[in-house]
């Protein structure tokens, strides 16, 4: 992957959405698309799309729009789609098992390659094709499989302790499904996913703003 310019966090969060929809268009045989058409499909305003794309230079042509194949190839490079990314799942309970069954089937370059759990009856088994390891094997497997991203689905009470172990093992990114906002060094990035908070926010918007569609 080539060195990419620094872009705003909000733009970075939209890039996978662009890539997924461009993949759909390419598979459907669509050759080109305008920012207005893209806006209508993914519900981001056209000005936002054009601004996002402008961070990477001239990706389209005035009066023509965007070449779908060229844009897809460009974002595949930006998102490093040619590299297989192994991900560790920490916690093979109900949510963890759901994520194992999902296992990023819509992504061609990411997979959960190892899961870890404190329950000794789960360690040594295979769920949805993924081996479950004991927590004592965490550092060994993360090193052996060159994993630098982990998904955290453990109880809140042990979330920080497990996070510390992940950092010590060399993890650089954590997708945190626990309610706890874990503390990590500056060189480790955490993305928090709080389903309860998201639902409460959704209820608030419905109650106060109706069914207005909003983007990121």
From Swiss-Prot:
Binding site for NAD(+): 91-96
Highest taxon in the source lineage: Bacteria
Keyword field: Cytoplasm, DNA-binding, NAD, Repressor, Transcription, Transcription regulation
Alphabetical list of InterPro entries matching this protein: CoA-bd, NAD(P)-bd_dom_sf, Rex_DNA-bd_C_dom, Tscrpt_rep_Rex, WH-like_DNA-bd_sf, WH_DNA-bd_sf
DNA-binding positions: 17-56
The UniProt record lists the keyword Electron transport: no
Described purpose of this protein according to its UniProt entry: Modulates transcription in response to changes in cellular NADH/NAD(+) redox state.
Subunit structure: Homodimer.
PANTHER family: REDOX-SENSING TRANSCRIPTIONAL REPRESSOR REX, REDOX-SENSING TRANSCRIPTIONAL REPRESSOR REX 1
UniProt-recorded name of the protein: Redox-sensing transcriptional repressor Rex
Name of the gene: rex
């Amino acid at each position: 992957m080539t060195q990419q310019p620094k872009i705003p966090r909000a733009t970075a969060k939209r890039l996978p959405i662009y890539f997924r929809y461009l993949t759909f268009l390419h598979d459907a045989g669509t050759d080109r698309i305008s920012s207005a058409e893209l806006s209508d499909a993914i519900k981001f305003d056209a000005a936002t799309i054009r601004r996002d794309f402008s961070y990477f230079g001239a990706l389209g042509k005035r009066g023509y729009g965007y070449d779908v194949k060229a844009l897809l190839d460009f974002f595949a490079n930006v998102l490093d789609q040619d590299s297989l990314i192994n991900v560790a799942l920490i916690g093979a309970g109900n949510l963890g098992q759901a994520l194992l069954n999902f296992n990023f089937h819509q992504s061609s370059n990411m997979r959960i390659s190892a899961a870890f759990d404190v329950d000794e009856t789960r360690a040594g088994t295979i769920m949805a094709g993924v081996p479950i390891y004991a927590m004592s094997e965490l550092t060994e497997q993360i090193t052996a499989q060159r994993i630098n991203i982990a998904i955290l689905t453990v109880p809140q009470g042990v979330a920080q302790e497990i996070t510390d172990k992940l950092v010590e093992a060399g993890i650089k990114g954590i997708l945190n499904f626990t309610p706890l906002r874990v503390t990590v060094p500056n060189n480790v990035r955490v993305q928090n996913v709080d389903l309860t908070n998201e639902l409460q926010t959704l209820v608030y918007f419905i109650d106060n703003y109706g069914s207005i569609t909003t983007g990121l």
